[in-house]
């Protein structure tokens, strides 16, 4: 059986060997994107869309980010630009699936964290380890129960 999830896609552009480098990451509220200085490059990320895992990357989100970069850094030069689109598993209610997945026998799942997977991953890993080891914990995980979707499939 399939669990209810969708592909949440994020886009970013990297400017390699820029003529200037921000001293710290910036969240540009007006442009709705984030600028992150990295070794030898600047990453400009923004735009989220939902699409199937088979759908190709769209040009419009990348063009939007390029316009925001040009507005924020009109004098910036760089060697080259790279474009990226990645998929994150997302549930239809925005809550991750954490717990036993009865549809796959004795298995457990822990996915669908969207943009906070790296942040929530360590704690989620501990919770799943407790579950499969039958170690009790005091966390109420009912909101994350995969059965909320399995019952409707």
Indicate residue ranges for each PLM-predicted region.
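C-terminal lid/capping helical subdomain adjacent to the catalytic/cofactor pocket in oxidative enzymes
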Residues: 97, 101-153
């Amino acid at each position: 059986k399939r669990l209810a999830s969708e592909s949440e896609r994020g886009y970013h552009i990297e400017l390699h060997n820029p003529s200037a480098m921000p001293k710290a990451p910036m969240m540009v509220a007006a442009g709705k994107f984030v600028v992150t200085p990295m070794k030898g490059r600047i990453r400009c990320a923004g735009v989220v869309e939902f699409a199937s895992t088979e759908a190709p990357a769209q040009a419009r989100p990348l063009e939007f980010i390029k316009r925001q970069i040009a507005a924020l850094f009109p004098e910036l030069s760089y060697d080259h630009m790279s474009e990226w689109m990645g998929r994150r598993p997302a549930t239809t209610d925005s809550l991750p699936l954490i717990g036993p997945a009865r549809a796959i026998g004795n298995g457990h799942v822990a996915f669908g964290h969207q943009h906070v997977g790296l942040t929530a991953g360590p704690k989620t890993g501990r919770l799943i380890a407790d579950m499969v080891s039958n170690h009790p914990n005091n966390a109420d995980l009912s909101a994350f129960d995969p059965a909320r979707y399995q019952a409707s499939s």
